[in-house]
Amino acid sequence: TLLTDVGSTKAEVLAAAVRVFGKDVRERFLAGHPMAGKEQCGMEHADPDLFQGAAWFFSSSNGQDIYGGLSGEFIELVSAIGARTAGMDAAEHDKLCAWISHLPQMISTALAAALVDEYGEQAPLLEAGGRALREMTRIAGSPYSMWRDIALTNKDNLRDALLKLEQRLAHIRENLDTRELAMEFEKAHHLKKIVPRKRGELPKSQSRK
């Protein structure tokens, strides 16, 4: 029997699995994380295409061959439902997700909370923000009950990402009237060029389908 999970952080989960399964952890547990969440929860929001093209990370204990035995069979099943799979060290995974998943959630939450403080219940004014505002605050509706545990189990990486973003925002704030602002836009445009256009595309060295 193989046990797996779909949690957003992996280091603490793997450590707990080692405590539970001991020397058998490599054969009994496979840590997984599908990058295909939604801001809504519950069966009424189920989506049959949720995993189509989505990245699905797997992290192993030291020396575990995740593509062999029951782990390999499960990964083949994940690929069969349309997800793109990749193996990644747990610590590397948690740092990456702090930047590409957890930080965006905190940005959306902070922006939405700031708008409530600034404009309260003045919905007509907020609706004037249009598509940009809706896109930036879409995941602000995500449940705290889920994100509480993510923040607790990845707090060091998330704090580091938040600190670096704070420094970046401070730099922008101090350079609204200088050439530095244009350079920030140039960096942002470069990211748009290198980020995969389709959901779930992974570097060939990491991906397996």
Give, region by region, the residue ranges found by the protein language model.
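Long, positively charged, glycine-interspersed low-complexity recognition regions
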Residues: K193-K209
